[in-house]
């Protein structure tokens, strides 16, 4: 549970990405250009656990629905837009944990924040303070 705190203290932030994703590559290039210290994690090969997702969701203050990659083929093929409203929080967390491609990316996880998706102004405000 506290491994992310350790990552922050030792190696900067936790950056979750899918290398084939153009937005993730753009975000990573920006992080490197700004000399932001982070640990990289492939979101599909080392997918987030239910516990991690619950912790990040609570830390973010965002609705859980925002954690879904609504642009992804898997999300669309599973017709999740129609199904999520009928699912409990626990069911949604289990679903997110089942496949990293369902999770919105990239993510940057800090001790007291979660950045979801690459929004330059938000990233500058949080990471360059």
Model-based region annotation:
Residues 45-129:
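Thiol/selenol-based redox catalytic cores and closely related redox-interacting motifs
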Residues 7-34, 38-41:
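Local sequence-structure signature of Cys/Sec-based thiol-disulfide redox active-site neighborhoods
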């Amino acid at each position: 549970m506290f491994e992310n705190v350790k990552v922050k203290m030792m190696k900067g932030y936790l950056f979750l990405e899918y290398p084939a994703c153009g937005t993730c590559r753009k975000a990573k290039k920006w992080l490197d250009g700004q000399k932001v210290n982070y640990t990289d994690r492939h979101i599909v090969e080392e997918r987030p656990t239910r516990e991690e997702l619950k912790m990040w969701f609570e830390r973010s203050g965002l609705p859980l629905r925002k954690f879904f990659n609504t642009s992804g083929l898997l999300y669309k093929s599973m017709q999740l837009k129609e199904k999520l409203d009928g699912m409990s929080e626990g069911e949604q967390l289990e679903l997110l944990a089942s496949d990293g491609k369902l999770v919105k990316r990239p993510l940057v996880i800090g001790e007291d924040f979660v950045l979801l998706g690459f929004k330059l102004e938000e990233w500058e405000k949080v990471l360059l303070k």
